[in-house]
């Protein structure tokens, strides 16, 4: 779920 997920960025 990147890069639109903050915890993945």
From Swiss-Prot:
GO molecular function (one): ion channel regulator activity
Which residues are recorded with the post-translational modification Asparagine amide?
Answer: 9
Tissue specificity annotation: Expressed by the venom duct.
Q: At the top level of its lineage, which domain of life is listed?
A: Eukaryota
Per UniProt, which keywords does this protein have? Amidation, Disulfide bond, Ion channel impairing toxin, Neurotoxin, Secreted, Toxin
GO cellular component: a single term: extracellular region
Per UniProt, subcellular location reads as:
Secreted
Which pairs of Cys residues are joined through disulfide bonds in the record? 2-8
Its UniProt domain note says: The cysteine framework is C-C.
Belongs to which family? Belongs to the O2 superfamily. Contryphan family.
What job does this protein perform?
Answer: Its target is unknown, but this toxin may modulate voltage-activated calcium channels (Cav) or calcium-dependent potassium channels (KCa).
Query: Which protein is depicted?
Result: Contryphan-In1172
Q: Which organism is it from?
A: Conus inscriptus
